[in-house]
Structures are given as structure tokens and as C-alpha cells.
UniProtKB/Swiss-Prot annotation:
Residues 39-148 form the tRNA-binding domain. It is an enzyme of class 6 (ligase). Its EC number is 6.1.1.20. One of its GO terms (cellular component) is phenylalanine-tRNA ligase complex. Its cofactor is Mg(2+). Keywords: Aminoacyl-tRNA synthetase, ATP-binding, Cytoplasm, Ligase, Magnesium, Metal-binding, Nucleotide-binding, Protein biosynthesis, RNA-binding, tRNA-binding. NCBIfam families: pheT_bact, YtpR. The gene is pheT. It comes from Buchnera aphidicola subsp. Acyrthosiphon pisum (strain APS). This is Phenylalanine--tRNA ligase beta subunit. Residues 701-794 form the FDX-ACB domain. GO terms for biological process: phenylalanyl-tRNA aminoacylation. It is found in: Cytoplasm. Belongs to the phenylalanyl-tRNA synthetase beta subunit family. Type 1 subfamily.
């Protein structure tokens, strides 16, 4: 929000410098982002009076003027402005005057006549960009005075930034309250703006969606002149606030919004049938805005309609039928209070302006009626018209009654760290407009209606500190009450080791936010409960991640859209899930994840280009696991996993504990996530790698190895891994290297069988194995496989 310092000082004028005033605004919790010292770039412009106006002999578009600027000689000026006429007082740039953009006024001949100056519009003075008519001053303005001094243009333009919980500071009134409290001043009571009804015409209000809309105020004003010019005093303030419009009604609404912080809406009353109905939209209803922009609605959108059509949506989103224009004569002025829980939804759904969101979030229910009266008063004074009575409808109004909060003196002193006298605290609370009752050791307080952010005792303490000023808080050493957890050196070591291995394999490390889009997470993990944030940065970052995969897939899509043909990325970090057995009901684990997509190698003349596959990623993962533990402690079990291809996915186990998963992206998610079918991912939890024993170093045997190969037929549904594991169990007391070197799947003629080729390499540390010993062990192993898997030895 931007505003002029002079506008603020009209409401509250502490005897402090501008610099200190700006600091006080920031100290009140409303950040001052920027202060611009405004000085208009024109000089030599004075007020003049047109005493003679005739048409130019050679042009019907030009007029020859005689202008009095308070000197003996009248100036001869040629002008083509449409509103140029005899008797009005205007801004005259005399010969030698300078205007913005380094324009200097000189005496010159136009169509054969001398012009000794120029009549100026606001645009030519660098003020209002859309105002090209020459300036007309009130009749009582003195001729010859300096226009620069008359306009009092020198001012400080202050830009403030607020957080979503402090919309009370998003108005001149709200800022004045804060500054008054800091300086122990009182702002003047709001002026009486009561406008009595002249006509009894009104529009009925029917609130059907009473959970979403708390109340609705509205009145009709008839016979207004919407084409009048906006008064200069209002133009200047709105210009400095960067919201000046050509429409006087829009300007008045903006003026009330900035001054009081109360959003109002205006509709063309002639296009409203009978009544206004506040309801939820129906299925497949549409709203058409100006320029035929169409908004498709659903049953979750609050609308304001009449019996035939939708009129508007919250946030001043008006239908093209009822939006005011230059032909509007009768208007309906309204204010409504929306449930704050609903506002966040509609803001994100309709992509409303953030500032307007904060205004609607911070509507003061006790100021709505006054805001309508104030706007009505301004409209009648500037545009004329006759007002009807204010029609008001209230529902669930008790929702906005602030609760009583108990503030304990001992608690306040403990949090602040030193003693503040009760009289000082009471005085500060009164300055902040709290209602309070002191009871020896505590206060029962009720915050003002515009401070809905005050919910608990700590909020009140924070408010007191703002006024007491943080600079007055005594500096004392910090007391630590920390429950520090021991650093997991093993996990840190595993992360560093894994990163080195992956980087050497051509991977790039990425870092993503721990906050992700719940829609994306639900696509990948539809059966998992999301851990939602109560005050997210944005809707796309509103839940904690369950996995590193959503971030990696977003990175894959980003790089794919930038024509990257070979992508290898990895990430490590914390993931969060709901677990009532854990402290605070949340479990957090450190995960390592990687993703690959595209070509295995870059394009070259020597190697054939192929796509990366499941086994490329599995091999890289095994390189990591081999550096952590024995590979025979790792098991890959085929399993259907949400988010992964049902035929290319596996769970990963370490000593029979599930530690992660690996596979190709589910084809059903490719389009939604904008990734290709050649995208593969793995993810493992590093929390499960505990009690890892150091690798044993053994002396290499001096005796030769002996190899035996067998081929067996088993059912194709039996995993080769299970067969190999059974062989390892059989030879657990011998030094035997067992390897699967061949798989061949038969067709239906062999009853869905597959052949496994298995090699056994024997070695003894003390002697050479004899053939009969090895043959006997192989026969016994085959017997176990026959019994366990109905395996048949191929001859």
C-alpha cells in the first residue's frame, strides 16, 4: 500500500520528524518498504483567468485567448482544449516556464498568431496520466499565484508492506491508531457521516450461504452524475497511492478503502432484479466480465446474484451486466463480511490481488455501516443523487466477537525477561483500545474489533512490547532450555559417501523446498495423509513432503522443457509423515533419492545411443549400498508401488527391513507430471542403516578356485532372487561365490517355465577342493532347490 505522509498527518500529527515517523510505522509491525520524496518537475506555472475566448480564423480546433495572470498586460495564448472557455481560471505556463521531460515554454507563432504561453492539463504537469483536459480552478482562486505552491505537491510517498495477520494496518485509519498509541495521543473521533434516506426504495437481501457470508449492508443511490471530474484533493491522494482512475465512483470507493480499510462494492442498480441473493454457485454456472472474459464456477464458489443471473463474486469481481460505466445513473452500494476461513480459498481460486485479499480478511464489522455512510456522503457531494435507506442483513455475527484473554503479570515478566509495572501495562493496553479489567495479578482483556489476530496471551504480550518499544527491553544473557538431539554422524557420513559416488557417476545434486503442492503429492501417494501447513507461502507449497520424488520429478520436467536429453539428479533431505507414536505426532526421516531420464550417453560417433533403463539406476544404487553394507544383506522384491510402473517396481530391504523403493514412473502420471516413460527413480531411508559393522578384511586364499555351473527349470512366477538366496543359505559355512549368469523364459509349450543358469565358484583357504566333494555339495544343493521350488535340473 502507498500513501502520502500528509494524508496520514491529517489524521494524526505527532510532533516528530518524517524519519522518526517512518521508524514508528515499522516499529508498529507495519514494514516501511520505501519512502519517496515527491517533487513535481514544473516551474513558472501560475493561475490565470480567461477573459476573452474566440475561435482561430484559420482553424476551428484552435481558440485565441486573452488570459489575465495578475499583470498589467494580458497574455495572448492559442489553445485547442475542448473545455477551454471564457471566465474559467486555468494553469498558465508562461514564457520561460519548465515542464516535466525538460520542456521549456517559448513564445511562438501558431497558425499566424502569437502564443505567449500554454494552458496546462494535469498530464502536462506530470501528475495524472489520464487527465488531458486543462486544469480548472475554483472561482475563488487568486489570479497570479504559483500553481506549485497552490497544489502543495511536495510530500513523502510511503510504501508499506504488511503480513496477512495485520490487515488493520492497511489503511490511514489503522496506521493512525498505531502511531497514536506509540506517541500516547488520541485520534479524533470519526466525523458524523450519517446520510438520511430521501427515498424509501431498497433492494432486499437474502443470505442463503450464511456460513460463508456473515452480513451484508447495501443502499440504493439514484440520479447520480457519474461523468463529473474527481476533485483535485482526492485526485492527489489517489495519485500518490497509485490507484487513480478516470471513473469518479471507482475513485470514491478507492478513497474510502485506503482511508478506512473497508472494501465496498458498486453495482448498476438498474440491472438488478428484485433482490440480491448470497449463495453458492451452481454446477457449470459461468460469470462473464468485461471484454467477454469468462469465469467457470463450481459449487464451492460464493456468488451474489439476483433471481436471474450472477451479479458478482467476492473481491469486487462484477458481471459485465452490472458493472458501472459512463451511462450509469442509479447505483447499489454494498459492504459484506466474508468468513475468513473461506477467504483463502476464494483468493487462490480466483487469483485475486493480494492487497484486496488482506482488506477483505480484515473487515471491521463495526465499521461497515460507517464506510457506506462515508462513501454515500462523498458521492452526494461530488456526483449528486438521492439515497435510499441502508438495508442490512446479519448472520452468525457472534463469530466476530473477540474472546476474553487472561494476561498474567508473572507470565508477561517471564517472557520479556524483566519487570514492568502494572500501571504501565494498563496504560499501554488502554492506548491500544483494549477493554480490560485488572484482578491483582492478571488482566482480563478484549482486543478491539479490528484486531482479529489477537488470539492468545502471547499475542497481547507482543502488542504491549510494540508500544513499550523493543529498544527499552533490557539486554540479559539468554537462558537455554534446549533438548538437543545427538548429531547422527553415521547418517552424515552416508550422505557424503553417497553424494561422492553419484557425482562420479554423472549425477547433479538438487535442493528443493520441503513444502510441495498437495495435488502432486496426492497423484504419487493417493493413500497417504498430507501434513498441511496452516499458513502456507502459497497453495503450491501448502503441505510437507512425504517423499523427495515430487521435487525430483519437477526438476526432471523443468530440464526436459529446456531440451536436456540426458538427466541424472539426486537429492537428500528430511521427509515428514503423520505418526501418532512420534513426538508431536510427526515422523521425520532422512531420505536419499535419485532420478534418471533420457539417453544413457551423449550423442557421439562411436557408441549407439540408447535410453536409460531400470538396471542403470539399480546399478548406481547398488554402488551406494555396496559402500554402506554387504550386498547380500540387500534384497530387491518385486512389488506394485503407487507412483511407479506396476511391472517395473520393487521394494528394497536391508536385513528384512523395508528401506526404500525403485522403479519406472507410472505411465498414468507421465502427462500430469510432464515426464517421459524413460524416467526412473529410487528412494532409500538412511535412518535404517544402524549397527553397520565394519567390513572384514581377509587374507586371499593361495589355493585355486573350482567352478560348477548348473541350469534348472522353475516356474516363471518364482523370483530368481529367492533361488539364489536359498543357495547362499545352503553354502553359508563355505566360501562360495554364487552368481546368476543366464535366464531364459520358455513359451507355453513348457508350461510357463523359465531356465536359470547359476554358477558356483568354490575356494578353500587351507586346501584344494576335490571333485567328489564339490559334486556332492552341488547334488545336495539341487535337492534342496527341488524340494523348495520344484526345480528340475536340465541335462
Amino acid at each position: 500500500m502507498k500513501f502520502s505522509e500528509k494524508w496520514l498527518r491529517e489524521w494524526i500529527d505527532p510532533q516528530v520528524s518524517s524519519k522518526i515517523l517512518h521508524e514508528q510505522i515499522s516499529n508498529s509491525g507495519i514494514e516501511v518498504e520505501h519512502v519517496e520524496n515527491f517533487k513535481s518537475e514544473f516551474h513558472g506555472v501560475v493561475v490565470g483567468k480567461i477573459v476573452q475566448c474566440t475561435f482561430h480564423n484559420e482553424s476551428n480546433n484552435l481558440k485565441v485567448l486573452k488570459v489575465d495572470i495578475g499583470k498589467k498586460k494580458l497574455l495572448n495564448i492559442i489553445c485547442g482544449a475542448s473545455n477551454c472557455r471564457n471566465g474559467i481560471k486555468v494553469a498558465v505556463a508562461t514564457v520561460g516556464a519548465t515542464l516535466p521531460k525538460n520542456i521549456t515554454i517559448n513564445k511562438k507563432i501558431l497558425k499566424g498568431a502569437w502564443s505567449e504561453g500554454m494552458l496546462c492539463s494535469f498530464f502536462e504537469l506530470g501528475l495524472f496520466l489520464n487527465d488531458n483536459k486543462i486544469i480548472e480552478f475554483p472561482k475563488e482562486t487568486l489570479v497570479g499565484i504559483n500553481v506549485y505552491d497552490y497544489f502543495l505537491l511536495e510530500d513523502n510517498i510511503i510504501k508499506v508492506s504488511i503480513t496477512s495477520n495485520r490487515p488493520d494496518g492497511l489503511s490511514i485509519l489503522g496506521l493512525s491508531r498505531n502511531i497514536a498509541a506509540i506517541n500516547d495521543l488520541r485520534i479524533s473521533p470519526l466525523k458524523n457521516r450519517l446520510v438520511p434516506a430521501v427515498i424509501q426504495k431498497k433492494i432486499n437481501i437474502d443470505i442463503q450461504a450464511d456460513k460463508e457470508c456473515m452480513n451484508f449492508f447495501g443502499r440504493i443511490i439514484e440520479n447520480i452524475n457519474i461523468n463529473v471530474d474527481t476533485p483535485f484533493w482526492m485526485k492527489k491522494k489517489l495519485f500518490f497511492s497509485n490507484v487513480l482512475s478516470e471513473n469518479i465512483i471507482t475513485n470514491i470507493i478507492h478513497y474510502v478503502l485506503i482511508e478506512l480499510g473497508q472494501p465496498l462494492n458498486i453495482l448498476d442498480a438498474d440491472n438488478i432484479n428484485d433482490s440480491i441473493i448470497v449463495r453458492m454457485a451452481r454446477h457449470e454456472e459461468d460469470l462473464f466480465l468485461k471484454n467477454n472474459i469468462k469465469i467457470s464456477l463450481n459449487e464451492n464458489i460464493l456468488v451474489f446474484s439476483d433471481s436471474n443471473k450472477i451479479l458478482s463474486l467476492p473481491g469486487n469481481i462484477n458481471s459485465n451486466i452490472v458493472d458501472v460505466d459512463k451511462n450509469t445513473k442509479n447505483i447499489f452500494l454494498s459492504s459484506y463480511l466474508i468468513n475468513r476461513k473461506y477467504i483463502s480459498y476464494i483468493i487462490k481460486k480466483m487469483n485475486m490481488n493480494t492487497v484486496l485479499e488482506y482488506h477483505y480478511y480484515g473487515v471491521d464489522p463495526f465499521l461497515q455501516n460507517y464506510a457506506i455512510e462515508y462513501a454515500t456522503d462523498l458521492i452526494l457531494k461530488i456526483c449528486g443523487g438521492v439515497p435510499g435507506p441502508i438495508n442490512e442483513k446479519k448472520c452468525n455475527f457472534q463469530i466476530h466477537k473477540n474472546n476474553t484473554i487472561r494476561l498474567h503479570h508473572e507470565r508477561l515478566n517471564k517472557i520479556i525477561g524483566f519487570f514492568i509495572d502494572t500501571s504501565v501495562i494498563s496504560k499501554i493496553l488502554y492506548r491500544l483500545d483494549y477493554q480490560l479489567k485488572f484482578q491483582k495479578t492478571f488482566w482480563d482483556v478484549i482486543s478491539p474489533s479490528w484486531r482479529f489476530d489477537i488470539l492468545i496471551e502471547e499475542d497481547v504480550i507482543g502488542d504491549i512490547l510494540r508500544i513499550y518499544e523493543y529498544n527499552n527491553v533490557h539486554l540479559i544473557p539468554l537462558k537455554e532450555f534446549l533438548n538437543c538431539s545427538k548429531k547422527n554422524e553415521l547418517t552424515d557420513s552416508l550422505l557424503k559417501k553417497s553424494a561422492v559416488i553419484l557425482i562420479n557417476q554423472g549425477y547433479h545434486e538438487v535442493i528443493n523446498y520441503g513444502f510441495i503442492d498437495p495435488k502432486i503429492q496426492n497423484l504419487i501417494f493417493p493413500n497417504e495423509e498430507n501434513l498441511l501447513l496452516s499458513n502456507p507461502i502459497s497453495q503450491d507449497m501448502s503441505c510437507m513432503r512425504l517423499s523427495l520424488w515430487p521435487g525430483l520429478l519437477k526438476n526432471i520436467s523443468y530440464n526436459k522443457n529446456r531440451q536436456q536429453k540426458s538427466i541424472r539428479i539426486f537429492e537428500s533431505g528430511l521427509c515428514f509423515s503423520i505418526d501418532k507414536r512420534e513426538n508431536l505426532g510427526i515422523r521425520q526421516e532422512i531420505f536419499l533419492a535419485a532420478a534418471i531420464s533420457g539417453n544413457y550417453i551423449k550423442e557421439n560417433w562411436y557408441y549407439n545411443i540408447r535410453k536409460m533403463d531400470f538396471y542403470d539406476l539399480k546399478g548406481d544404487l547398488e554402488s551406494i549400498l555396496e559402500s554402506i553394507c554387504q550386498l547380500n544383506e540387500i534384497e530387491f522384491r518385486r512389488k506394485k508401488i503407487h507412483g511407479l510402473h506396476p511391472e517395473q517396481s520393487a521394494s528394497i530391504y536391508f536385513r528384512n527391513y523395508l528401506i526404500g523403493s525403485i522403479g519406472a514412473i507410472d505411465p498414468r502420471l507421465e502427462k500430469a507430471l510432464n515426464v517421459s516413460s524413460t524416467t526412473f527413480l529410487f528412494e532409500i531411508s538412511l535412518n535404517n542403516f544402524s549397527d553397520i559393522k565394519p567390513l572384514k578384511v581377509e587374507e586371499i586364499s593361495k589355493f585355486p578356485t573350482v567352478r560348477r555351473d548348473i541350469a534348472i527349470l522353475i516356474s516363471e512366477e518364482i523370483a530368481a532372487y529367492n533361488v539364489i538366496e536359498q543357495c547362499k543359505i545352503f553354502f553359508i559355512n563355505e566360501k562360495v561365490e554364487i552368481n546368476l549368469f543366464d535366464i531364459y523364459a520358455y513359451k507355453e509349450s513348457h508350461n510357463h517355465k523359465k531356465s536359470l543358469g547359476i554358477s558356483f565358484i568354490f575356494q578353500n583357504k587351507k586346501r584344494t577342493f576335490q571333485d567328489n566333494e564339490i559334486n556332492l555339495m552341488i547334488d545336495d544343493c539341487i535337492g534342496v532347490l527341488q524340494k523348495k521350488f520344484q526345480a528340475v535340473l536340465r541335462k
